[in-house]
Regions:
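A short, surface-exposed loop/turn module that caps and links secondary-structure elements
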Residues: 29-55
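Enriched for short, Lys/Arg-rich terminal
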Residues: 1-7, 11-25, 40, 56-60, ...
Length: 87
């Protein structure tokens, strides 16, 4: 399997600063797992977009986009489940 590159948007990096520090390593580990498989069994496609997906990490949601041709996973947001789907 070909690995993907993970890019963090500024918004996702800012989101990490507002999250409980004990949860951050779990979230980073989950994001790093997307390098080998950007479509893990627990991923879900978001209805509003053709290429946006989410994974669940406890009470947090990681919203990301996959470019299969360029082999890039872009992390857009990391938010609590109550805030994750609001624009």
């Amino acid at each position: 399997m070909v690995s993907h590159e993970v890019l963090w948007k500024g918004s996702a990096e800012r989101d990490l600063k507002n999250i409980d520090p004990q949860q951050v390593p779990r979230i980073i580990k989950a994001v790093e797992s997307l390098i080998d498989d950007p479509f893990p069994p627990q991923h879900r496609k978001l209805r509003a977009s053709a290429s946006d997906y989410r994974i669940r990490v406890g009470d947090y949601r990681v919203i990301y986009k996959v470019d299969t041709k360029a082999k890039v996973v872009t992390i857009h947001y990391v938010r609590h489940r109550s805030q994750a789907y609001r624009r």
